[in-house]
């Protein structure tokens, strides 16, 4: 889901 993707981008 897009919401999870946002957290992935913040993690990297």
Swiss-Prot record:
One of its GO terms (molecular function) is metallopeptidase activity. The keyword Secreted applies. Inhibited by carbon monoxide (CO). This inhibition is explained by the presence of heme attached to the enzyme and modulated by CO. The state change of heme induced by CO (carboxyheme or metheme) may inhibit the enzyme. Its EC number is 3.4.24.-. This is Snake venom metalloproteinase CatroxMP-II. The keyword Transferase does not apply. It comes from Crotalus atrox. It is found in: Secreted. It is an enzyme of class 3 (hydrolase). Snake venom zinc metalloproteinase that cleaves both alpha- and beta-chains of fibrinogen, but not the gamma-chain. Its cofactor is Zn(2+). GO terms for biological process: proteolysis. GO terms for cellular component: extracellular region. Expressed by the venom gland. This is the first SVMP that is heme-bound and carbon monoxide-inhibited. The heme-binding may serve to regulate SVMP activity during envenomation, with both protective and aggressive purposes. First, if the venom gland is elaborating CO via the enzymatic action of heme oxygenase, then inhibition of SVMP by CO is likely important in preventing this enzyme from disrupting the epithelial barrier of the gland and injuring the snake. Keywords: Disulfide bond, Fibrinogenolytic toxin, Hemostasis impairing toxin, Hydrolase, Metal-binding, Metalloprotease, Protease, Secreted, Toxin, Zinc. Belongs to the venom metalloproteinase (M12B) family. P-II subfamily. P-IIa sub-subfamily. Contains 3 disulfide bonds.
